[in-house]
């Protein structure tokens, strides 16, 4: 295409505007090459076309004689797939619970009667009845040897987990919630949900937890459940990746992961709504609820805790709370907010240093953190215990258990000592969490944060109890009426756990419901709501978002949030022309052959190409995805009349003349309109970045076209808009992000069409 022709086709977009865009490109290209590295690992879906395709399928079914049977089949098939996913998630959770508890206890001793029993089951099924358990034996009665064995087992477990992650599935490291949130929002990454990742997550998670690292299973359980849903839907060919149905499966699977991790089906559904999906969809909620019920039902049937309960620990408090305790409860809420912000800031600082100095030494990094954690934890009873067991003891009333640890904790003469031990445990575990969560092993942060809050809460309860014992007749304690047991420290541990979890995740309703389902403490509704709301408010004032959203932002993961664009003064008034791709590779509706089309696809590997009326007018008539072009080419090759110089057309074009065209058959032209999106989404060039962000969020197309005076002047993809919004929110001078991929010379490609040599490269055209 000559320079004059290119100028004619660009007449609707004046040269001054183009010079401005080119100058921006030169000044800002570095930023987008740097920030786009994480985004490029993801593919974008096209939800608009998926909705249209599903509607077309519905129309075909409606025209069938068996439409009612087809609809019954489709509905029943959906519930069948969800039940399979829920059942598999429940069984996986059962195995995780059993294996994790055994590995955690084997560091401290073994069962003489049944080697495969953990300490709790060993004592339950032992023939010896009484306060002491003789069937469970420590490895040795020497403190130094037990210390060494405890650390050696921890090192062995973490090495196995870290090596598996490094050599088999690096994407299995960490929690996975941030990436899954991006996938649900429309940025797809099939490798993150692969069978290999699922396998490593299943095997590596119990090892990582049993190693003594301050990590939990809840976040990885969400990732594991989503990989299960993804792979089952692929086996049954139930949902196309990127479709609305696929999104619902991912949300339902993620919700079931939380449900089985906490034994909280309603909490799992709320987690899917509040944290993962970012919106309210009745169908998605019903799917999530059914999947959670299936998973928790299977877990209840398998009964991993041998108590008939699916919750980690059930609490029954004989008394209630007093209004004067709200003062102490508020302190717990403030602590939760401060804890969350402190851990997040320190964690991301450590991660920055890890990426800079330890990116090649993930296994040694995890091993070093584990050894230090084990050496310190063994010296403190509340760090040495498994975190869930420790919380179970801290949540109890003193008169409700005969556990040796709880007996010591409830001894009035040991209050000062226990307060110091809990303070040390709180501080040490907070530091451990910041180092452990970023290790290259499967790792969650829910339970470690709850354990920190529980130890701190019980410590505050002991302090409140000591104040009451010192001043029983104070005005502050009039509601106690001189009762000996007026304050229950276990309730403070419960509320502290809720506050810390809210502070780190910035969730509200989900945490309140999870705590109720987890413990059954329904008479503490008001205090729980108070501490969660206070912790979340403190966190919002200090950091705005929780650790999952902040990980998305810091790691450069793609998540388009239009509310940020709308509320940002930097993007609300900036026209979309500042960030669009203006040098486009287009397909004219006339004068194009297979030879030119294939050469263009090999030379310019984009996900799709706009189709225009002709090279001069740039009037947009449709959009062709590369996958659709490949499908049309494979079908056309089967026709006897196929040649590489055969003319292509896209529907009825008046200027072509009388030559015939057909989809495939005896003609001099082939009509590809059936493979083209004939209703692409386009906006005027005067629209702002914020408005276009809303369109991407609501409709989720793969690309939006920009028009001026009826002609195509540019396009913007979801990835490019995401980078642009981020750049503006950082108050920088913006460049055209799309030119990371599309900064090519329109003149060069069109002039080269005449000299293309056919090469059997990416496309099998021989």
Curated annotation (Swiss-Prot):
Chain ranges passing through the membrane: 79-99, 145-165, 168-188, 197-217, 253-273, 285-305, 323-343, 363-383, 419-439, 443-463, 487-507, 521-543
Q: How does it sit in the membrane?
A: Multi-pass membrane protein
In this chain's numbering, which residues are marked as the site (Mediates proton transfer from the outer aqueous phase to the interior of the protein)?
218
Keyword set includes Ion transport: yes
InterPro entries cross-referenced by the UniProt entry = CBS_dom, CBS_dom_sf, Cl-channel_core, ClC
Region spans: Disordered:
1-22
Instruction: Give the protein name, as stated in the record.
Output: Putative anion/proton exchange transporter C19C7.11
Q: Which organism is it from?
A: Schizosaccharomyces pombe (strain 972 / ATCC 24843)
């Amino acid at each position: 295409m000559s320079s004059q022709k290119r100028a004619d086709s660009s007449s609707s977009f004046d040269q001054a505007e183009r010079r401005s865009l080119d100058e921006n490109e030169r000044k800002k290209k570095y930023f987008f090459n740097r920030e786009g590295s994480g985004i490029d690992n993801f593919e974008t879906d096209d939800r608009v076309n998926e909705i249209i395709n599903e509607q077309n399928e519905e129309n075909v079914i409606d025209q069938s004689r068996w439409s009612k049977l087809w609809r019954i089949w489709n509905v029943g098939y959906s519930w069948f797939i969800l039940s399979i996913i829920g059942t598999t998630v429940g069984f996986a959770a059962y195995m995780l619970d059993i294996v994790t508890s055994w590995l955690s206890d084997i560091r401290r001793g073994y069962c003489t009667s049944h080697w495969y029993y953990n300490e709790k089951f060993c004592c339950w099924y032992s023939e010896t009845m009484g306060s002491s358990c003789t069937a469970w034996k420590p490895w040795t009665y020497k403190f130094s040897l037990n210390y060494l064995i405890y650390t050696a087992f921890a090192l062995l477990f973490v090495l196995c987990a870290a090596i598996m992650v490094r050599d088999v599935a690096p994407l299995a490291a960490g929690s996975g919630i941030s990436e899954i949130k991006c996938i649900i929002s429309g940025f797809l990454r099939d490798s993150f949900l692969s069978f290999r990742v699922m396998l490593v997550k299943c095997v590596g998670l119990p090892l990582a937890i049993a190693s003594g690292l301050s990590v939990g299973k809840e976040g990885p359980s969400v990732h594991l459940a989503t990989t299960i849903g993804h792979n089952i839907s692929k086996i049954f060919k139930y949902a196309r990746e990127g479709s609305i149905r696929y999104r619902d499966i991912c949300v339902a699977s993620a919700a079931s992961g939380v449900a089985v991790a906490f034994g909280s089906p309603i909490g799992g559904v709320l987690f899917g709504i509040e944290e993962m999906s970012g919106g309210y969809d009745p169908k998605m909620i019903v799917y999530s609820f059914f999947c959670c019920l299936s998973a928790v039902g299977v877990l209840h049937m398998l009964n991993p805790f041998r108590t008939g309960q699916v919750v980690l620990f059930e609490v029954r408090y004989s008394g209630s709370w007093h209004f004067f305790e709200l003062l102490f409860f508020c302190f717990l809420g403030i602590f939760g907010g401060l804890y969350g912000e402190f851990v997040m800031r320190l964690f991301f600082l450590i991660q920055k240093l890890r990426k800079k100095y330890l990116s090649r030494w993930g296994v040694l990094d995890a091993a070093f953190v584990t050894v230090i954690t084990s050496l310190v934890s063994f010296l403190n009873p509340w760090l040495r215990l498994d975190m869930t067991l420790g919380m179970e003891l801290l949540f109890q009333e003193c008169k409700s258990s005969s556990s040796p640890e709880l007996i010591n904790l409830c001894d009035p003469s040991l209050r000062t000592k226990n307060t110091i031990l809990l303070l040390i445990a709180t501080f040490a575990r907070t530091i451990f969490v910041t180092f452990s969560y970023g290790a290259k092993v499967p790792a969650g942060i829910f339970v470690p944060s709850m354990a920190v809050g529980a130890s701190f809460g019980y410590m505050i309860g002991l302090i409140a109890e000591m104040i009451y014992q010192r001043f029983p007749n104070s005005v502050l304690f009039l509601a106690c009426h001189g009762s000996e047991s007026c304050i229950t420290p276990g309730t403070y541990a419960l509320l502290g756990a809720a506050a810390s979890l809210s502070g780190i995740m910035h969730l509200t309703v989900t945490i309140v419901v999870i705590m109720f389902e987890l413990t059954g403490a329904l008479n503490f509704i008001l205090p729980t709501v108070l501490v969660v709301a206070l912790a979340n408010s403190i966190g919002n004032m200090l950091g705005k978002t929780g650790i999952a959203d902040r990980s998305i932002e810091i790691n450069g993961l793609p998540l388009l949030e239009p509310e940020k664009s709308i509320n940002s003064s930097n993007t609300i008034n900036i026209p979309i022309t500042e960030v669009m791709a203006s040098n486009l590779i287009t397909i004219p509706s006339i004068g194009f052959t297979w030879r030119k089309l294939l050469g263009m696809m090999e030379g310019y590997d984009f996900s799709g190409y706009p189709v225009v009326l002709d090279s001069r007018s740039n009037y947009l008539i449709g959009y062709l995805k590369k996958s659709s072009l490949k499908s049309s080419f494979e079908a056309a090759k089967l026709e006897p009349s196929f040649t590489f110089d055969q003319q292509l057309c896209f529907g009825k074009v008046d200027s072509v003349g009388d030559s015939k065209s057909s989809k495939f058959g005896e003609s001099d032209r082939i009509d590809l309109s059936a493979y083209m999106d004939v209703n692409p989404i386009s906006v005027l060039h005067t629209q702002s970045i914020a408005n276009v962000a809303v369109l991407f969020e609501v409709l989720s197309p793969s690309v939006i076209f920009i028009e001026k005076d009826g002609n195509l002047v540019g396009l913007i993809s979801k990835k490019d808009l995401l980078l642009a919004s981020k750049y503006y929110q950082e108050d920088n001078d913006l460049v055209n992000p799309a030119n990371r991929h599309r900064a090519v010379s329109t003149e060069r490609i069109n002039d080269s069409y005449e000299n293309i040599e056919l090469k059997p490269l990416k496309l099998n055209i021989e």
